[in-house]
Amino acid sequence: MAQHDFAPAWLNFPTPPSSTKSSLNFEKHSENFAWTENRYDVNRRRHNSSDGFDSAIGRPNGGNFGRKEKNGWRTHGRNGTENINHRGGYHGGSSRSRSSIFHAGKSQGLHENNIPDNETGRKEDKRERKQFEAEDFPSLNPEYEREPNHNKSLAAGVWEYPPNPKSRAPRMLVIKKGNTKDLQLSGFPVVGNLPSQPVKNGTGPSVYKGLVPKPAAPPTKPTQWKSQTKENKVGTSFPHESTFGVGNFNAFKSTAKNFSPSTNSVKECNRSNSSSPVDKLNQQPRLTKLTRMRTDKKSEFLKALKRDRVEEEHEDESRAGSEKDDDSFNLHNSNSTHQERDINRNFDENEIPQENGNASVISQQIIRSSTFPQTDVLSSSLEAEHRLLKEMGWQEDSENDETCAPLTEDEMREFQVISEQLQKNGLRKNGILKNGLICDFKFGPWKNSTFKPTTENDDTETSSSDTSDDDDV
């Protein structure tokens, strides 16, 4: 026989006709069986987790309990003693088959009370189904807000009792009122308006109008709004508290405990992690406003970045002029002779075409680095490296002019192989090659192309002076 799989109540979805059909079905067939030996007790305990699982399994008066109509099973028990416990109300997917089976059992047990018991069963069935729909789908029947929610307790979790939309309305209205008028007076006059607010907006579909704040609220006190968002950036990440400063919200909390409609809502403000999806949907317009306010600094930063990039493009056009300026700037810093500079420039020109189409990337690097004293585009790590190279490489350059001898062909080939390997691995993008290829070309214009071989020699000097750059990378 089909035993019950103890499915939780929230898995079953309500289909109204099936439960009434099943209860009528029981009423019709209850007259076929003799119920004289043992009658059901009217106040029989209901089983919560096993919906429709009645206590007649081991008893002699089970009867044809829950005949499945669609499959056409007619199983008349022996003298009404065999319990064939099919899931009577489940064949239509009824969510509240528990109540229909239960009341049909009562009506079979007490035959003279057949009709009133079934009617009460249907009423209870409707009420429970309505409550279930309203708690889980408040947008389907907004008139549910008129009924009081009896089984609401703060101790239970959100799974047992989903958040009730009625208790949500005063909370959101507190937020709306607090934004407009008296928030600077630490919130005390505002709470006095609470009991009158649900009367205006608490019933019918107008609750959703109350949940959405008016667009006129932020412009009335713009300075207050901005200061509160700044204050919230430091401390709070809760969406409910985001329109208030923390201090003002605590004042609300302390005074709101005097009013019965607002106690649940104020306490639930701190339980924003367990709020239902409906709650989050209702808060979206307010949150989008706040995020717009909060991303002001970010948008300003992005605008500045775009401006810098546009400037860089302009400097790209005037690249020749800027390089000349850099050359004249570097003439003061370097004491090397014109001959060495010419030789190194020749090597530079030989080396750039050998980079296999990297010339465009390198030119961008040169431009960005050449504008370094003017614009703060480089990151902090590159700045630090720039400073370090200034301290190490550039000062040594004037002293160690004899090390600036032209590179041999072996060194050139070695450098090219290493740079190609690194290019293939894509390490340039990750910034690992900071003291390698990028730096060689980055500081080329400053030194009028004399710095490149010196960095090569410096790198080889630091790595035991005979080995290649493989040790550094």
UniProtKB/Swiss-Prot annotation:
Keywords: Activator, Cytoplasm, DNA-binding, Methylation, Nucleus, Phosphoprotein, Transcription, Transcription regulation. It holds the Pfam family Vasculin. It is found in: Nucleus; Cytoplasm. One of its GO terms (cellular component) is intracellular membrane-bounded organelle. Residues 119-133, 293-329 have a biased composition (Basic and acidic residues). Residues 456-473 have a biased composition (Acidic residues). Widely expressed. Some isoforms may be specifically expressed in veins and arteries (at protein level). Isoform 4 is widely expressed. Isoform 1, isoform 2 and isoform 3 may be specifically expressed in vascular smooth muscle cells. GO terms for molecular function: DNA binding; DNA-binding transcription factor activity; RNA binding. Disulfide bonds: none annotated. The keyword DNA-binding applies. Transmembrane segments: none annotated. Residues 194-204, 251-286 have a biased composition (Polar residues). Its main location: nucleus. The modification Phosphoserine is found at S49, S274, S276, S322, S381. GO terms for biological process: DNA-templated transcription; positive regulation of transcription by RNA polymerase II; regulation of DNA-templated transcription. It comes from the Eukaryota. Residues 1-25, 46-149, 191-342, 444-473 are annotated as: Disordered. The modification Omega-N-methylarginine is found at R87. Interacts with GTF2B, GTF2F2, RNA polymerase II and TBP. Belongs to the vasculin family. Functions as a GC-rich promoter-specific transactivating transcription factor. PANTHER family: VASCULIN (PTHR14339:SF11). This is Vasculin. It comes from Homo sapiens (Human). The gene is GPBP1.
